Design a protein with these regions (language model features):
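C-terminal substrate-binding/catalytic lobe of Rossmann-fold NAD(P)-dependent oxidoreductases
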Residues: 1-101
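Generic C-terminus detector
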Residues: 92-137
């Protein structure tokens, strides 16, 4: 599908991660609650909720460590729930990306697709997530 996505990188103090400001042009207007519901159901997106008290990427990495993640890896996009906003057909959000870890799961899925061992992307994602005991934030 053709999706017009614009991302901007910002200079902020971060620890082993980087932040994106994401702006998407949607096909139709969306409600913030519906977008959050979609994010919650996606196996590779996690919501960083205000209730966690997380205000930085360093705290997010520590949270992953507390969850028992190997090397405190964050395989999902850490989307700050309070940043999700919709304006007409535009969606905005901030996401934290652990550049050392987010590519791991995607590469595993890509290898399966390239060699043809799994044709269904959703099934490949589920297999990888299960092998890593990975449940998104």
């Amino acid at each position: 599908p053709k999706i017009n996505i614009v991302t901007l990188a910002m200079i902020v103090p971060v620890t082993m991660m980087h932040m994106h400001v994401v702006q998407m042009d949607l096909k139709r207007e969306a409600a913030r609650e519906k977008v959050i519901e979609i994010i919650e159901k996606h196996p590779r997106m996690g919501l960083v909720r205000k209730a966690t008290g997380i205000t930085s990427t360093a705290e997010l990495k520590e949270y992953a460590m507390d969850m028992g993640r190997s090397r405190s890896d964050l395989w999902e996009n850490g989307i700050f729930e309070d940043s999700v906003s919709c304006l007409g057909k535009e969606l905005y959000l901030f996401q934290a990306i652990h550049q050392e870890a987010d590519v791991v799961v995607e590469n595993i899925d890509c290898i399966r697709a390239m060699i043809g061992t799994e044709k269904d992307p959703a099934r490949s994602v589920a297999m990888t997530n299960k092998a890593l005991n990975f449940v998104a934030l």
